Structure formats: structure tokens, C-alpha cells
Amino acid sequence: MHVNGKVALVTGAAQGIGKAFAEALLLHGAKVALVDWNLEAGVKCKAALDEQFEPQKTLFVQCDVADQKQLRDTFRKVVDHFGRLDILVNNAGVNNEKNWEQTLQINLVSVISGTYLGLDYMSKQNGGEGGIIINMSSLAGLMPVAQQPVYCASKHGIIGFTRSAAMAANLMKSGVRLNVICPGFVDTPILESIEKEENMGQYIEYKDQIKAMMKFYGVLHPSTIANGLINLIEDDALNGAIMKITASKGIHFQDYDISPLLVKAPLTS
């Protein structure tokens, strides 16, 4: 899929990786709906992007992705405004081991909800023109992390769900591809959460171990993750792919023994 002329919806778009995604999509000619719960950050993000791009290229919608009604209304607003939806990036996420129910709701349940809403609008069975859904996971979705078990569980869930949904989308001839990005540590505000007891709870005493891991593995710039996003969108052969991005190896893919139904599925026109 060529990004130019397409309409994208990015959750968690006001800062960090989400903002980098929005910038990359705009640079490649897309129109972008910036979805975020943080009103102040969202308004600032749109204002900054308006200085680089035509204001009509972006739309900011305040939304708590954990609220099902707000999320449904947001998708409707975006499609009503731009007339279509081609690219969905479920990026919003938190790190909170203390309020673990919230972590699962935002990191996993909202991704599942967003994916199904995206399919409702993009699937050819529903009159859509196909498209692509990118769900944000993490390297923590591919390995155990003693200091963040709930965050780890949420990111594992994203991978299992997305790979399965990608197979289903192919079987249904929906015209929609689904892929996952699993970055390592990224220089975003979420890294600050490891310093806070209100986020880490009983695991706060292990924050120095996480810092040591960051030093060992390195910290990525959000623009590197955005490059991976564009690659996943533009390569029509990728469906159910798990893209890993690390400081040492850059962009590469997780290998699985998978069904032929999942590989090289030409789902979009």
C-alpha cells in the first residue's frame, strides 16, 4: 500500500512513538487523525504539525481508548471527517503494574476493540476498500519480564490476537492486513513510569534492574520505530508479521513456524 493519499488513525498520537508515527505518515502524504486522551498534549501536537503540514491534513480527537463508547464515536468522527479509513495504528499504551486492570484494559482490550472497529470500516465485506492495522506490542511481548509481569502479559496478548486476527482476515478475504511492531526501549515519556511507585507498585524496588537493562540494550529514537511502521504499510506481502526493532539489530522479524495461510497474503488492491 502506498501511504500517499491515505487516511490514518493513530491512538496515543500526542507524544512519543505515536507523534513520530503521525509525522512519518504526514511526510508520506497521508491524512492523520490524532487520537489521545490528553487534551493539552493533543492540541499542542496538532499545532506543531500544523506548522509543518497543511492544517486540514490532521484532526485531533480527544478519546480515552479504554472507554468503548468514546472509541466507537472516535472512529465514526474520523470517517465522517475524512470520508474513509485506510490505516489504523493501535499505539496507546501504559505501564502500570499497580493498577493492573487498567493496564490490561488500555494495552490489550482497547487494541482488540480498535482492531474490530477498524475491520468494521475497512473490510471489503462491509463495503470498505481494505487497509492495514498495525498493533503496537514490545519485546516484552516475546519474553518474560520479572519486573513488569502485567505489562508483559498485555504485550504477549497483542501478538497472539493480531496473528490470529490476521489469519481470520485472510480467510474472510477482508482486504485488511494486520501486523505487529515490537520495539525495545524507546525514548518516550513511558520510560519515566519505572521511577514511580504509583506505576510500578511492588516492583519499584527493581527499578535499577530495568535501568541496567536499558543501558545494556540501548534506547531507540521514536523515528526509528516510525520507519518500521512505513515499511509494514508499504510491503503488501506482510500479514501477521511481528517486526522487532532493537538498537543492536535495527528492524528485523520474529520467525515462527506458521500456517501458509499467514504468509504472503495479497490482501489489498
Curated annotation (Swiss-Prot):
GO terms for biological process: ductus arteriosus closure; female pregnancy; kidney development; negative regulation of cell cycle; ovulation; parturition; positive regulation of apoptotic process; positive regulation of vascular associated smooth muscle cell proliferation. InterPro entries: NAD(P)-bd_dom_sf, Sc_DH/Rdtase_CS, SDR_fam. The active site is at Y151 (proton acceptor). Its EC number is 1.1.1.141, 1.1.1.-, 1.1.1.232. Its main location: cytoplasm. NAD(+) binds at residues 12-20, 36-37, 63-65, 91, 151-155, 186-188. Expressed in proximal convoluted tubules of the kidney, where it colocalizes with the prostaglandin transporter SLC22A22 (at protein level). Expressed in lung, intestine, stomach and liver. The keyword Cell membrane does not apply. The keyword Cytoplasm applies. Substrate binds at S138, Q148. GO terms for molecular function: 15-hydroxyprostaglandin dehydrogenase (NAD+) activity; identical protein binding; NAD binding; NAD+ binding; prostaglandin E receptor activity. It is found in: Cytoplasm. It catalyses: prostaglandin E2 + NAD(+) = 15-oxoprostaglandin E2 + NADH + H(+); (15S)-hydroxy-(5Z,8Z,11Z,13E)-eicosatetraenoate + NAD(+) = 15-oxo-(5Z,8Z,11Z,13E)-eicosatetraenoate + NADH + H(+); (11R)-hydroxy-(5Z,8Z,12E,14Z)-eicosatetraenoate + NAD(+) = 11-oxo-(5Z,8Z,12E,14Z)-eicosatetraenoate + NADH + H(+); lipoxin A4 + NAD(+) = 15-oxo-(5S,6R)-dihydroxy-(7E,9E,11Z,13E)-eicosatetraenoate + NADH + H(+). Disulfide bonds: none annotated. GO terms for cellular component: basolateral plasma membrane; cytosol; extracellular space; nucleoplasm. SUPFAM superfamilies: NAD(P)-binding Rossmann-fold domains (SSF51735). Keywords: Cytoplasm, Fatty acid metabolism, Lipid metabolism, NAD, Oxidoreductase, Prostaglandin metabolism, Tumor suppressor. It comes from the Eukaryota. Belongs to the short-chain dehydrogenases/reductases (SDR) family. Homodimer. Catalyzes the NAD-dependent dehydrogenation (oxidation) of a broad array of hydroxylated polyunsaturated fatty acids (mainly eicosanoids and docosanoids, including prostaglandins, lipoxins and resolvins), yielding their corresponding keto (oxo) metabolites. Decreases the levels of the pro-proliferative prostaglandins such as prostaglandin E2 (whose activity is increased in cancer because of an increase in the expression of cyclooxygenase 2) and generates oxo-fatty acid products that can profoundly influence cell function by abrogating pro-inflammatory cytokine expression. This is 15-hydroxyprostaglandin dehydrogenase [NAD(+)]. The gene is Hpgd.
